Amino acid sequence: MQAEDRSQFGSAAEMLSEQTAALGTGWESMNVQLDGAEPQVERGSQEERPWRTVPGPLEHLCCDLEEEPQSLQEKAQSAPWVPAIPQEGNTGDWEMAAALLAAGSQGLVTIKDVSLCFSQEEWRSLDPSQTDFYGEYVMQENCGIVVSLRFPIPKLDMLSQLEGGEEQWVPDPQDLEERDILRVTYTGDGSEHEGDTPELEAEPPRMLSSVSEDTVLWNPEHDESWDSMPSSSRGMLLGPPFLQEDSFSNLLCSTEMDSLLRPHTCPQCGKQFVWGSHLARHQQTHTGERPYSCLKCEKTFGRRHHLIRHQKTHLHDKTSRCSECGKNFRCNSHLASHQRVHAEGKSCKGQEVGESPGTRKRQRAPPVPKCHVCTECGKSFGRRHHLVRHWLTHTGEKPFQCPRCEKSFGRKHHLDRHLLTHQGQSPRNSWDRGTSVF
């Protein structure tokens, strides 16, 4: 069956090539020679369906509906497709038809080879579903046939690089400088505007390396029909997201503090403050208010940290007070030394007139009352331990005894001096050197 179809197609192609060589007036005569019985198609129907099959010897391939689906499918793939012949003649259309016939004479032409041979007006008239169907057949293996039909396909250099195993095409920065690069700005509502800001210049789109080698990536700069093509036929482009210069000003306005826009001003001196608490603290200097007071001494302060610093002075209460001058002291020993000063002052007041303080001998403080009295001799002492030590002289008791020679002593320092003799040291030398037995 396929051999018969090829022979029929070859005879039809030879006859059609001879007839096209003799044509010189219009496309109507060519339609009559191809099929004299075929009615002329209206202009409106040609725009709706730009492609149709060639009637004639291959007409039985699509008319036999009783055959098996598989055989019908094989016949449909082998059937040649030619463009609908327009009413008016055009030199470009003649060249496309001649190239199509030359390609068909070499072998069967499938729908995949010529599925994208549309003009720009015809491509725009297709539905999105049709453009998706035809667009996916723009492959590397079919580019040669499509180019032979003079269909404009960009990025032919990339196809040669793909065949040689080179990297995909990346735009040259020098070429991009010659082009008018749109500079867009972001207004916050999703709209784009042209601008002269060099920092926001859009970078040229680059192709992803993960795109298949059989897919031709289209660029809107080379074809006006880019807007009408579906997203699946446009290829994959990579570019940075567009920044908009107004977004920086909007971001700044949103982050500015309301207090900076409406500062707090002092009505008296005109000073401005960021925070209202700072203004309230400043106004205390004008009113003289002291809201912080000490609970112990009832002192008032204008700052809280001043009150905290003052409260540290109350941690150590000064209970020792001098009865003469009213001074407070933390220790009683300090009070006793202070009272000696008052005693010396009183003695100085009682000195004779004309006697200078330098010639006056220093007088001791008044003696401590001797309340501890010895019952044997009636001697009195100011300290109790002095009385105990004196009592030993009456009893003859010697409580301090040497552990080596069992000698006893009435005073402890006498025993310490005796122990130095057992060590071979002189008590005088040991005391001079400041050494001790223990």
Swiss-Prot record:
GO terms for biological process: regulation of transcription by RNA polymerase II. The keyword DNA-binding applies. CDD domains: KRAB_A-box. Keywords: DNA-binding, Metal-binding, Nucleus, Phosphoprotein, Repeat, Transcription, Transcription regulation, Zinc, Zinc-finger. A zinc finger (C2H2-type) spans 264-286, 292-314, 320-342, 372-394, 400-422. Signal peptide: none annotated. InterPro entries: KRAB, KRAB_dom_sf, Znf_C2H2_sf, Znf_C2H2_type. One of its GO terms (cellular component) is cytosol. The modification Phosphoserine is found at S191, S426. Residues 1-53, 345-367, 418-438 are annotated as: Disordered. Highly expressed in skeletal muscle, moderate expression in heart, liver, and pancreas, lower expression in placenta, no expression seen in brain, lung, and kidney. PROSITE patterns: KRAB, ZINC_FINGER_C2H2_1, ZINC_FINGER_C2H2_2. Residues 17-32, 422-438 have a biased composition (Polar residues). Transcriptional activator. Activates transcriptional activities of SRE and AP-1. Belongs to the krueppel C2H2-type zinc-finger protein family. PANTHER family: ZINC FINGER PROTEIN, ZINC FINGER PROTEIN 641. This is Zinc finger protein 641. It comes from Homo sapiens (Human). The lineage of its organism: Eukaryota, Metazoa, Chordata, Craniata, Vertebrata.
